[in-house]
Amino acid sequence: MPGTRPFTLLVVLVAAASLSAQAPRELVKQAVQTELVASENDHTHWLYFESDSQPSKSVKQWVAEARLVSLSRVIERNGQTVSEAQQKQEMSAFINDPHAQSKQHKSGQHDDEQAAELLKILPDAFLWTKTGESGGTIQLHFKPDPEFHPPDIEARVFSAMEGDMAIDRDQHRIATLKGRLIRDVKIGYGILGELQAGGTFDVERRELSPNVWEIVETHVHIQGHALIFKTISENEDDVKSNFRQIAGTTSLQQAQSELLSLNPDPQKQETADRSAAEQRASAGRDERSTTQPRASHLGKNPKLAQR
């Protein structure tokens, strides 16, 4: 009803003002809780193009998240193009190797669990300050909280960071997280290793479908002589693009067929996808137009003909 619009607008404005008035740490707690719940309930599977660069190796590949594990079609390795025959051979080898699949599955579970644990300490490990709002996000700055006592090595490294985080204003999701190691971190009193101050990390996330957010870029540049994360090197740039949602029941064989149907060049594939989408939209318009009665069939009543 028209009379309810001012009241509805007032409620929206009050809710927005309430969000802005929240203490920075409470904003972070809300975002963390939202992320944990979303992760638990997210059962989407994706196909995407990935470019991953590390000092010792680099790879460009199409990746399909099948039912339990992911299958990769490596297009380029260390700057060298991988032949299509080799691509097929590598995918088939993985499909027929239960041990490799189990190893990937366990590694993924470990990474997810570790990420969740680090996410949980985010509100308390740092002192938070709101620095502004921009583009639908709330900007926050963080620095180590001297009262926080990290429970393990990973948390100790994480809590030695200072940086910035952006939270999506409407969905309370973490959009970006950037940090810099502000002090050296010794592991085992320096005997097991040391990470040097000045190292950085930068993570960007994007909403791919309603309420589904995924990491699209990860940049880690930390100098030292110890690895903290099993699947992330100290120097790595990982960028994902060309996301396409696929069925959660996709088998590895189906994933292989889907991957082989793609153009090795992600830009050309994006152009092909856009063209296909336009053709489907055009076909839909044509179909609707053929089902609508023509004006000549409506008689001579001009008002009826205009409906």
Regions found by a protein language model. Name each.
Residues A21-E162, D170-A175, R180-G199, E204-S209, ...:
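Structured extracytoplasmic
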Residues V212-E214:
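Substrate-binding/catalytic groove segments of enzymes
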Residues T8-S18:
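Bacterial N-terminal signal peptides
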Residues P6-F7, P24:
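Short amphipathic alpha-helical segments that mediate assembly, nucleic-acid/protein binding
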Residues M1-T4:
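N-terminal secretory signal peptides that target proteins for export/translocation
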